[in-house]
Amino acid sequence: MKSRLQVRSAHVPLWSWIIPLFGCVIAAMTLAHVLPERSVVLLLMSAGLLTGAVFASVHHAEILAARVGQPSGAILLAVCVTIIEVAIIGSLMLSGAEGNEEVARDTVFAAVMIVLNGVIGLCLVLGGRRHREQSFQLNAASAALAVLGTLATLSLVLPNFVTAGKPQQFAAIQLVVIGLVSVVLYGVFLFVQTVRHRDYFIDDEDAASPPATHETPRNPLAAGALLVLALIAVILLAMLLSYPLDSAVEALGLPQAVVGVTIAGVVLLPEGITSVKAALMNRLQNSINLVLGSALASIGVTIPVVAAISVALGRDLALGLAPQNLIMLILTLFVGTITLGTGRTTVLQGAVHLAIFTVFLLLSAIP
């Protein structure tokens, strides 16, 4: 069976480079004040281009991921998505909008809840409906959950209980240490996933099949160049839309956390679709790699970067979760440990995760 990341065409789809290129041009002209910044039509067009650029970047990352194989391919996709996430968060933090000290926390928390409850819930429900019971490598899930639980607790829970900084915030030295610990721990996990215990993270069918190949050697080179173009488009469009997004949420009277949920939802949409497709093909191990990899990268990469921005520029960075979100995180990690603790899943576990995700969305809009 071909890998789920198999590239079936030697031709680069037109949309995958036209949208990022057009997005770069529109964003650059607007930021240079050639086009009107407050135009509603332009902002709506930019939002559509941002979504398209996210899909394009993940598409090109998938081409590269197919060349390197699993589990490295899942890592590449997760890092690509996290770069986009960091770019959007950084743009909002530097925009000067009210509440921007909380956007990193809200986005990272939303990303964890979306992938661990929304995406994994859909994977288990749809995959279980088609294949009844699905299996995956228990060692892989255990290793990832151990790191994820530690990083989430240190980054999102501990700030509520330290006394050296402001409420829900680390002091500068604490923030530096937590950032370094996150980078090191995530780096060790990547070493285990790609070198020391690589076999833990490989699907049985992937191990038995030869690596995916492309019809032309030009594909990876073109994909690499277009991936850079797509990421640049995302960064420029994020800078353009950062202030209007904050203003829209405020005008609608919604909590600031909705900004984080929106960012995480847009960024994770393509990868979520890929994960669900893998589950439908009875490749649950690939889905688990993508889901847990995204959650780990979201904390292990995003937190150190925003911590560096905060310390370097002297900006406040609130990371501690509100009480209701703290309960939701603990519940998610607890249920996730049970769900992924046997190596086999059914529709029931997926339904539980979707129920938690529904409550998370409710609390995001109505705390």
Swiss-Prot record:
Location of this chain's protein in the cell? Cell membrane
What the entry lists under Pfam families is as follows: Na_Ca_ex
Q: Which InterPro entries match?
A: Alkaline_pH_Ca-Antiporter (IPR052946), NaCa_Exmemb (IPR004837)
Gene Ontology cellular-component terms for this entry are:
plasma membrane
Q: Which family does it belong to?
A: Belongs to the Ca(2+):cation antiporter (CaCA) (TC 2.A.19) family.
Name the species this protein comes from.
Sinorhizobium fredii (strain NBRC 101917 / NGR234)
Query: Where do transmembrane segments lie in this chain?
Result: 12-32, 39-59, 74-94, 108-128, 143-163, 172-192, 221-241, 249-269, 291-311, 318-338, 347-367
Protein name per the record: Putative ionic transporter y4hA
Where mainly located? membrane
Sorted keywords for this record are: Cell membrane, Ion transport, Membrane, Plasmid, Transmembrane, Transmembrane helix, Transport
Q: List the membrane topology term(s).
A: Multi-pass membrane protein
Task performed by this protein: Possible cation transporter.
GO MF annotations in UniProt: potassium:proton antiporter activity; sodium:proton antiporter activity
* Disulfide bond annotation, renumbered to this chain: none
